[in-house]
């Protein structure tokens, strides 16, 4: 009986060690200071003013790693990379789509509170107010491919510039209508 307990304890120890060794290359390949993914953010609902119906957004898969860099000028940069999957549901009809959004990105919050972001690859959900969607000629809710860059002023958080060198992969509202 004692031998069985020792064998079981060694088995548990080796399994735990195997899990650590298996996870290490994923973090090591990204270098130091990368934080492993946390569970996807909580689902949220956009009001009908965005799509003509209430839209539920959830993140069933989150394998996104983050690195936080603090700068001498008081700004903070967030680097992120990895796979995220978002699901979008029209709450009026129940129609839903799921979209992989695997693009890396960089967001800098400047000391004055303004924000600059650059995303490449597949990225989303990119959400604009109806007024900003009209101003920039983009859908209110989209998944995009290519380089998406934008700047936001310090509070009250007005988009001051936006460029998409790529294309809209999914106009979420149109896809769920």
Locate predicted features.
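Beta-strand-enriched cores of mature, soluble protein domains
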Residues: 29-177
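Bacterial N-terminal signal peptides that target proteins for export
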Residues: 1-10
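C-terminal segment of classical bacterial N-terminal signal peptides
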Residues: 15-25
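Functionally constrained cores in energy, signaling, and assembly domains
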Residues: 5, 15, 139
